[in-house]
Amino acid sequence: MLKMGVVLFIFLVLFPLATLQLDADQPVERYAKNKQLFNPHKRRGIILRAPGKRCCHWNWCDHLCSCCGS
């Protein structure tokens, strides 16, 4: 009877606990949530730097940069 109790305990308690997905096992979702908290102006700066364009004052806008708006 003791062996059957141990087997039941393993399959009914320990096995389901080992197969649960914890929040810490999902780093992609946490990273996406953290990225949404960026200031919109910071995101714009990151996006502008990606293609290599600069952000210029609205008086100095030309084909080498894009206007910042302020």
Swiss-Prot record:
Residue ranges listed under propeptide: 25-54
InterPro entries the UniProt entry points to: Conotoxin
Highest taxon in the source lineage: Eukaryota
Signal peptide: 1-24
MF GO annotations: ion channel inhibitor activity; toxin activity
Entry keyword set: Cleavage on pair of basic residues, Disulfide bond, Secreted, Signal, Toxin
Cystine pairings recorded for this chain: 55-67, 56-68, 61-65
Organ and tissue specificity: Expressed by the venom duct.
Cellular component aspect of the GO annotation: extracellular region
Compartments, record wording: Secreted
Domain notes: The cysteine framework is III (CC-C-C-CC). Classified in the M-1 branch, since 1 residue stands between the fourth and the fifth cysteine residues.
Family, as annotated: Belongs to the conotoxin M superfamily.
More about this protein: Shows a very weak inhibition on Nav1.4 and Nav1.8 sodium channels.
Function: In vitro, inhibits proliferation of the mice ovarian cancer cells ID8.
Protein known as: Conotoxin Mr3.8
Origin organism lineage: Eukaryota, Metazoa, Spiralia, Lophotrochozoa, Mollusca
